[in-house]
């Protein structure tokens, strides 16, 4: 019971932080692919300032690049 509540709480927190990230950075969700180029310029301070939703998006993007499905779109 506790583990289900914890999982639901974590999912809700990720969704809420993603919502606030889209409000704070609307250009990153409007097809602005220059944001991907900015990832090359990140240093340690930038990584420490990332929000949890940003880390989830970076992880999803890295997994997409590693997957075989991504190569089909090139």
From Swiss-Prot:
Membrane-crossing residue ranges in chain numbering: none
Compartment(s) where it occurs, according to its Swiss-Prot or TrEMBL record: Secreted
UniProt keyword list: Antibiotic, Antimicrobial, Secreted, Signal
Predominant location: secreted
Tissue: Expressed by the venom gland.
Gene Ontology CC: one annotated term: extracellular region
Signal peptide bounds: 1-24
GO biological process, one term: defense response to bacterium
Record-stated family: Belongs to the non-disulfide-bridged peptide (NDBP) superfamily. Long chain multifunctional peptide (group 2) family.
Annotated function: May be an antimicrobial peptide.
Name this polypeptide is given: Anionic peptide clone 10
């Amino acid at each position: 019971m506790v583990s289900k509540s914890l999982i639901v709480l974590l999912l809700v927190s990720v969704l809420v932080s993603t919502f606030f990230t889209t409000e704070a950075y609307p250009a990153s969700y409007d097809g602005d692919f220059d944001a991907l180029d900015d990832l090359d310029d990140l240093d340690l301070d930038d990584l420490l300032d990332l929000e949890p939703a940003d880390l989830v998006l970076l992880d999803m993007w890295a997994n997409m690049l590693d997957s075989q499905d991504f190569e089909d779109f090139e």
